[in-house]
Amino acid sequence: MTIERTFSIIKPNAVAKNVIGSIFARFESAGFKIVGTKMLHLTVEQARGFYAEHDGKPFFDGLVEFMTSGPIVVSVLESENAVQRHRDLLGATNPANALAGTLRADYADSFTENGTHGSDSVESAAREIAYFFAEGEVCPRTR
């Protein structure tokens, strides 16, 4: 099987709960290698650009407001079948539908404040990684 990369965000509500280390531990326990990570505080322009596909939808302004309300942690994760495995670990977007033991079941507060984001395809992962990480900021793990 081919090694893939996926993109992950720990959103402001989960950062505020001080569970970054717990989430990273769950990534690693699930077999992911963290090959890039950083904390940042999105500007309105960055949030609008990242979520541009949702512009015009009723929840867009609230999503931008939430995503700029505090720091986030963006990461690049690597493993076999990374995109699907990461999405399985996150759980359903709506935490009311998230299975017990998933990150959203454990750390989400609402549909918008669902604690985490994960790429939905290999193509989205590549685009999202490039949005936040410059060349050389992702370090392949060889050991």
Swiss-Prot record:
It comes from Enterobacter sp. (strain 638). Its EC number is 2.7.4.6. One of its GO terms (biological process) is GTP biosynthetic process. Keywords: ATP-binding, Cytoplasm, Kinase, Magnesium, Metal-binding, Nucleotide metabolism, Nucleotide-binding, Phosphoprotein, Transferase. Homotetramer. InterPro entries: NDK-like_dom, NDK-like_dom_sf, Nucleoside_diP_kinase, Nucleoside_diP_kinase_AS. Belongs to the NDK family. The active site is at H117. This is Nucleoside diphosphate kinase. Major role in the synthesis of nucleoside triphosphates other than ATP. The ATP gamma phosphate is transferred to the NDP beta phosphate via a ping-pong mechanism, using a phosphorylated active-site intermediate. The lineage of its organism: Bacteria, Pseudomonadati, Pseudomonadota, Gammaproteobacteria, Enterobacterales. One of its GO terms (molecular function) is metal ion binding. It catalyses: a 2'-deoxyribonucleoside 5'-diphosphate + ATP = a 2'-deoxyribonucleoside 5'-triphosphate + ADP; a ribonucleoside 5'-diphosphate + ATP = a ribonucleoside 5'-triphosphate + ADP. Pfam families: NDK (PF00334). It is found in: Cytoplasm. PANTHER family: NUCLEOSIDE DIPHOSPHATE KINASE (PTHR46161), NUCLEOSIDE DIPHOSPHATE KINASE DDB_G0292928-RELATED (PTHR46161:SF3). Its cofactor is Mg(2+). Coiled coil: none annotated. It comes from the Bacteria. ATP binds at K11, F59, R87, T93, R104, N114. PROSITE patterns: NDPK, NDPK_LIKE. GO terms for cellular component: cytoplasm.
